Design a protein with these regions (language model features):
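A glycine/threonine-rich phosphate-anchoring loop and its flanking beta-alpha core
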Residues: 14-114, 209-210
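C-terminal charged capping/lid subdomain of soluble metabolic enzymes
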Residues: 215-288
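Short glycine/serine/threonine-rich phosphate/pyrophosphate-binding segments
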Residues: 3-9, 47-50, 166, 170, ...
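N-terminal small/polar loop signature for handling phosphorylated ligands or for N-terminal nucleophile
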Residues: 1-19, 133-144
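Alpha-helix C-terminal capping segments
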Residues: 9-16, 31, 160-162, 180-181
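Active-site segments that bind and position negatively charged phosphate/pyrophosphate groups
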Residues: 106-239
Length: 288
């Protein structure tokens, strides 16, 4: 899974570094050499088997940060859906939610390539269609194959070619949450995504057509059944929320998840200081 593959990437990078491995996480430019890495993926989730980055947590400092270098591409990865059939239902769901978030981060940008738009919409439909299938029948190799192939394409840049770069704001926020609280990454993303997308829609009305297209082409709604684009866009987010709940994502608020505002200021400061992209790179205006 992602944690194992990402830890392996950090070990490969740190093998030739004369100092703590965390140095490399804080300053990715220090990665000057790396051991070759082979991965055998056993869950459809992070896409780390086909990208050059890792996410590393420091439990002593409550930090969860990216480590990226072109020296960290796996030399070879074995991607066999048969290895995923014993994944627990809750981890399968978390993996699908992670996959969806990877693509939505690259979809809700101000300028998207038509090719990327169609690719992402098709992948999102694939994940939404096949996740309930494997929950009902974990041994369905066809559905497992679709989920695994979808997740593998999430973070290697293919889905972003020709589009405006995204600062991946949902991941920036979720990393702060799961760095401090015991929340599975994919579930945290599923909790945050509908809320963040509503913020996008509120702050950037120019996204309305994108949201309407998402509602139609991803969530399967019909535009002629709604009085306005605004109503269609909101219905798409409602249906996204309903999908998450249907596959077992907890319908909870922050309080129910054991999260209060104690660390919000520190978390916001950490995003501003350490995230790989500045706040100005996010698709809509963000402030601490």
């Amino acid at each position: 899974g992602g944690s194992t593959m990402d830890a392996s990437k950090a070990i490969c990078a740190a093998a030739g570094h004369d100092g703590p491995a965390w140095d490399l996480v804080l300053d990715n430019s220090l990665v000057n050499d790396a051991l070759p890495l082979m991965t055998v993926n056993t869950i459809a989730a992070t896409g780390s088997e086909y990208d050059n980055s890792a996410v590393i947590s420091n439990i002593e400092t409550n930090e969860k940060l990216p480590l990226a270098s072109d020296l960290l591409w796996p030399v070879v990865s074995f991607i066999d859906p048969a290895y995923t059939i014993t994944v627990l239902a809750r981890q399968t769901v978390a993996g699908s939610c992670d996959t969806m978030s990877h693509f939505m981060e690259q979809y809700f940008v101000k300028d998207i390539s038509p090719v990327a738009e169609g690719l992402i919409e098709g992948i999102l439909r694939t994940v939404i269609r096949n996740t309930p299938v494997v929950l009902e029948n974990p041994g369905d190799l066809d559905a497992r194959s679709e989920l695994l192939w979808a997740s593998t394409l999430g973070c290697n840049g293919i889905a972003a070619l020709g589009s405006q770069a995204s600062g991946w704001p949902c991941h920036a926020i979720e990393h702060e949450v799961s760095a401090r609280y015991d929340i599975t990454h994919g579930i945290g993303l599923a909790f945050l995504t509908p809320r963040l997308l509503r913020y996008f829609l509120e702050k950037a009305p120019e996204f309305l057509d994108r949201f309407a297209g998402f509602a139609e082409r991803v969530m399967g709604l019909r535009a002629d059944e709604f009085d306005s684009c605004e109503a269609l866009a909101e219905a798409g987010l409602v249906k996204l929320d309903a999908f998450y709940k249907s596959v077992g994502v907890p319908a909870a608020g922050l309080a129910e998840l054991g999260i209060d505002n104690t660390h919000f200021e520190a978390m916001a400061e950490h995003v501003e200081k350490h995230w790989f992209a500045p706040l100005e790179a996010f698709p809509v205006p963000f402030t601490r």
